[in-house]
Amino acid sequence: NLGSELIQDEDEFIQLCQLNIQAGMRAKNSTAYHAALDYLSKAFSFTNDQWWESHYDMKLSIHTDAAEAAYLSHQFEKLDMFIDPGLKHARSLLDKVDLYIVLASAMVAQGKLREAVDMTKPVLAQLGHPYPAFATKKHVIIELIKLRWALRNTSIAQILNLPEMSDARHIAAN
């Protein structure tokens, strides 16, 4: 990273980004969240908005992983720098889900529970899992009755033998 200002070739920038991403992920997996954020921030600094077109997956990964490292290291003031452009440039709702999860987790960690719920409800609705504006005991009872009715002729063994969920929208909503 120290000689990065001397790099002229885009392929070398890509390689340097990949190395910083790898170092950031290793640091994160070792619970060294501050170091992870440093590496991922460095990778972020080597990119620009053109990367959303030319290196979309890498750019999205940098934004998502850096946002998560900022959250895990409690550097909440840095979240917007990664999340806002990530949400703006992500090509699909499924590409945005991990960013929304990090944002909601950070809100909860900061005691902003109502904001987290308000932010996630429209996302869940777009994923096909709408929630009422104000869930009451009645809503919960109705949903439990629906569930019991749907499972009325199903044994635990049958449930255990069901195939794994494969619908990306339902997986993302969980």
Question: What are these model-predicted stretches?
Answer:
Residues 1-106, 115-123, 165-174:
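Extended alpha-helical scaffolding segments used for macromolecular assembly and cargo binding
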Residues 101, 111-170:
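Alpha-helical repeat/alpha-solenoid scaffolds of the HEAT/ARM/MIF4G superfamily
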